[in-house]
Regions:
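C-terminal motif of bacterial Sec signal peptides marking the signal peptidase cleavage site
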Residues: 2-6
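FKBP-type peptidyl-prolyl cis-trans isomerases
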Residues: 7-392
Length: 392
């Protein structure tokens, strides 16, 4: 729920040369460490509102429908290459067919680079790739209707004047197709257990029924996570509005310095300063710092409020639970948190003990948030916009 990086987005994994720069930066951070500052939350949280059984409202659609399952299942089938069922009672292509072809494009009689493919499934009616749903040049599939399996047919195509390749822009070309099979779009009725078993071997899904159950389980998990996050945000906002918190200036300054250090380690290197990063993202360092401060104040208030609740409710953390939490961070794929010590250094600005203390505090805060959410009276209002858009 909370993290030291709450003021910004996670960066992509860096190249190995950048990792070295980042690790060095973490080691040399010598600013005041917020983890070393003594905080008396009973004095800093000057007003702690009632937090048991609070009433909050969230909006959204968290029930998974059969239509959603079918739509997502069809997208999954397309991703795994299951796009059509072969038609065997006729051999002539019709407008609404999918057609498997090999094709080659010719410019002035010579095959051109990037103009050929094998075993491509074409959606004739929509003039697009049946699997990727990417559109072809106008007229590309016009010559396929009426062709027979085993035949070779041609289509004359003129590329647009603004086509990305200057060699082809505005040029007249010819595409030759070999018709290899006729297919109908796969549907829930035509999907078979054998098709599922062949495509989902690694997942050990062998039947259509199992695939439907798998997709529903994934969607229900996503919906539950979305509902949980919405509930957490609503509870946090409610208590932020009702509680009063004082943040010591030196503590806020330390947190902002720590965050900037972490941000620069993630996003800056020998070839990109913070100023250059800001310029590349159409902003300024001053504007970035203003945003960081605004978000950090909210972050700290949440930590103080729920930290105080944890004190009042005697919420603590066991060593086993904390180890599981750290192991989860290690497995997250962040190159800067490859092992337990690296995690502590990452959250402690190079200081393992500070990082360990900070993480334990954050974990307890998260437990307190869960405690309040579990006791809250949460009303769900359907998101009418989402419902209407899904029906259209």
């Amino acid at each position: 729920v909370l993290s030291m990086g709450a003021c910004g987005t996670d960066s992509d994994k860096k190249a190995s040369t950048q990792q070295g720069t980042q690790e060095t930066a973490s080691e040399v951070f010598d600013g005041p460490h917020s983890a070393q500052m003594k905080l008396d939350l009973s004095k800093l949280v000057t007003k702690l509102a009632d937090y048991k059984g609070i009433d909050v409202t969230i909006s959204g659609n968290y029930d998974v429908t059969d239509d959603q399952v079918e739509q997502n299942l069809m997208s999954l089938l397309s991703y795994y290459g299951i796009t059509g069922v072969e038609v065997k009672d006729r051999d002539t292509v019709q407008k609404n067919d999918y057609v498997k072809v090999d094709y080659t494009g010719y410019l002035d009689g010579d095959a051109f680079d990037g103009g050929s493919a094998t075993d491509t499934m074409i959606d004739v009616a929509n003039n697009c790739d049946a699997t990727q749903k990417t559109n072809y040049i106008d007229g590309f599939s016009d010559g396929l209707v009426g062709a027979k399996v085993g035949e070779e047919v041609s289509s004359d195509v003129t590329f647009p004047e603004n086509y990305q390749s200057s060699d082809l822009a505005g040029k007249k070309t010819t595409f030759k197709f070999k018709i290899k099979g006729i297919y109908k779009p796969v549907t829930m009725d035509t999907l078979t257990d054998d098709m599922v078993a062949d495509a989902f071997t690694e997942q050990k899904i062998t039947t259509k029924k199992d695939l439907v159950a798998y997709v529903r389980q994934v969607l229900e998990k996503q919906a539950a996570n979305s509902k949980s996050q919405a509930s957490i945000s609503a509870v946090e906002d409610d208590l932020l509005d009702k509680c009063k918190v004082t943040i010591p200036d030196e503590y806020l300054d330390a947190r902002l310095q720590e965050y900037q250090h972490e941000f620069e380690a993630d996003n800056c290197n020998d070839t990109q300063t913070l100023e250059q990063y800001a310029k590349n993202n159409n902003t300024t360092v001053d504007d970035m710092k203003k945003q960081w401060k605004e978000l950090m104040i909210k972050q700290i208030k949440i930590e103080f409020i729920f930290g105080r609740i944890a004190e009042k409710e005697n919420i603590t953390i066991s060593d086993d639970d904390f180890k599981s939490f750290v192991d989860y961070l290690v497995s997250s794929g962040n190159s800067q948190m490859a092992d337990e010590n690296a995690v502590y250094k990452y959250y402690g600005g190079g200081n393992k003990e500070d990082g360990k203390k900070t993480l334990r505090q954050l974990y307890v805060v998260n437990q307190a948030i869960s405690y309040v959410v579990e006791k809250a009276n949460i009303t769900v209002e359907p998101d009418t916009q989402t419902t209407e858009s899904s029906e259209n």
